[in-house]
């Protein structure tokens, strides 16, 4: 410390000053009164604004916004139906509500193909149960669930979707959190994802 000569008084004064400068800027120092009633509507508005500003459209080619005559949508991709609203660990927060992709499309006036939605919902439920068997490990509740792999629709189903809908939307997603290392598939497309994209594009671009 200072008495031993290993730390100068000037360094100590500088560090104390920095701590005090931070304290006087804090809400508590300025008389902030605690309230357990946050303005959730204002928070939601900021979140929406941040989401819009944080999105990056890599390529468009006149696809977006969707043409006014489009009303029926075939939605592909497990993430379209198993929506990722937050992360794992500290990224998993309490939220008043979540607007999923399907809800957002419906709110915008689009009709989601019911048969395709039923097919994906059934697949995701069965795969999630298979990949996440019940465990007696008390730490299991803190671990993120393994998400269902990508569903590759059959040629017959795709042909039906093309005839019943105006456009296809494909969603891919990755969850994120803490204390787990990334794997190759977190950065690249899996074989199932590539197969699904190729199959859907080939069917709808005929």
Task: Describe the role of every protein-language-model region.
Residues 27-36, 58-61, 206:
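A structural signal for beta-strand and strand-to-loop patches characteristic of beta-rich domains
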Residues 1-30:
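Long, well-ordered, tryptophan-enriched scaffold segments
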Residues 1-7, 41, 45-206:
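C-terminal non-catalytic regions of proteins with extracellular/luminal or membrane-system context
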């Amino acid at each position: 410390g200072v008495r031993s000569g290993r730390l100068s008084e000037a360094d100590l004064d500088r560090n104390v000053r920095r701590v005090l400068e931070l304290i006087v800027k804090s809400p508590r120092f300025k008389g902030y009164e605690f309230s357990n009633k946050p303005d959730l509507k204002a928070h939601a508005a900021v979140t929406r604004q941040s989401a819009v500003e944080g999105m990056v459209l890599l390529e468009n080619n006149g696809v977006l916004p969707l043409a006014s005559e489009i009303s029926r949508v075939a939605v592909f991709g497990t993430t379209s139906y198993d929506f990722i609203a937050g992360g794992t660990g500290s990224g998993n927060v309490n939220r008043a509500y979540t607007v999923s992709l399907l809800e957002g499309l419906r709110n915008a006036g689009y009709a989601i193909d019911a048969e395709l939605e039923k097919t994906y919902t059934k697949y995701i439920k069965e795969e999630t149960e298979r990949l996440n068997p019940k465990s007696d490990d008390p730490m299991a509740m803190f671990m993120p669930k393994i998400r269902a792999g990508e569903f590759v629709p059959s040629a017959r189903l795709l042909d039906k979707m093309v005839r019943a809908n105006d456009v296809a939307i494909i969603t891919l997603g990755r969850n994120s959190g803490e204390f787990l290392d990334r794997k190759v598939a977190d950065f690249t497309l899996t074989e199932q994802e590539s197969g699904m994209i190729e199959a859907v594009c080939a069917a709808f671009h005929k």
